[in-house]
């Protein structure tokens, strides 16, 4: 049974019903509907922490989906899973792929910045301040790009940029 038919919580059920109605009403191909179904099941599995199942669904959605904009969100969600699993290098790769298809994803820039900032903190703990500065500079670059797309978001990042003197650079 597809995951979308066994959702237990109200929000997932509501999303599934609305998505099913939209799929019936909006003229789309069978392939597009199937891709969206896998994407929807991937989101459901991801929200429940079932990352392996979510990845399987996202990979199937990627196999079927041809629209670059829609693919960007699939790639972004794959990046989220790799971030959650601590696979930061893989996550960065998927976020970059998402941005190649849709450069207007501030959340991808933010997540890449968070990973870079984390790596900077790790470098400090390892006694490598030069490497830490490079990671922090990269984080700043990503945050600036995300903030440019969503100026009212990422207030903590904006404050960090101001405090560290990286806002104007």
Swiss-Prot record:
Q: Name one Pfam family in it.
A: TPR_1
> What SUPFAM superfamilies does UniProt report for this protein, alphabetically?
TPR-like
Q: Record's InterPro entries?
A: PSI_Ycf3_assembly, TPR-like_helical_dom_sf, TPR_rpt
Spans through the membrane? none
Q: Where is it localised? A: Plastid, Chloroplast thylakoid membrane
Provide one Gene Ontology cellular component. chloroplast thylakoid membrane
Q: List the disulfide bonds.
A: none
> Domain of life of the organism in this record?
Eukaryota
What UniProt keywords apply to this chain's record, in alphabetical order? Chloroplast, Membrane, Photosynthesis, Plastid, Repeat, Thylakoid, TPR repeat
TPR repeats by residue range: 35-68, 72-105, 120-153
PROSITE patterns, alphabetized:
TPR, TPR_REGION
Q: What is its main location?
A: plastid
Topology of this chain in the membrane = Peripheral membrane protein
One annotated GO biological process: photosynthesis
Q: Which HAMAP family match?
A: Ycf3 (MF_00439)
Its family?
Belongs to the Ycf3 family.
Function noted in UniProt? Essential for the assembly of the photosystem I (PSI) complex. May act as a chaperone-like factor to guide the assembly of the PSI subunits.
Question: Protein name, please?
Answer: Photosystem I assembly protein Ycf3
Give the species this sequence originates from.
Chaetosphaeridium globosum (Charophycean green alga)
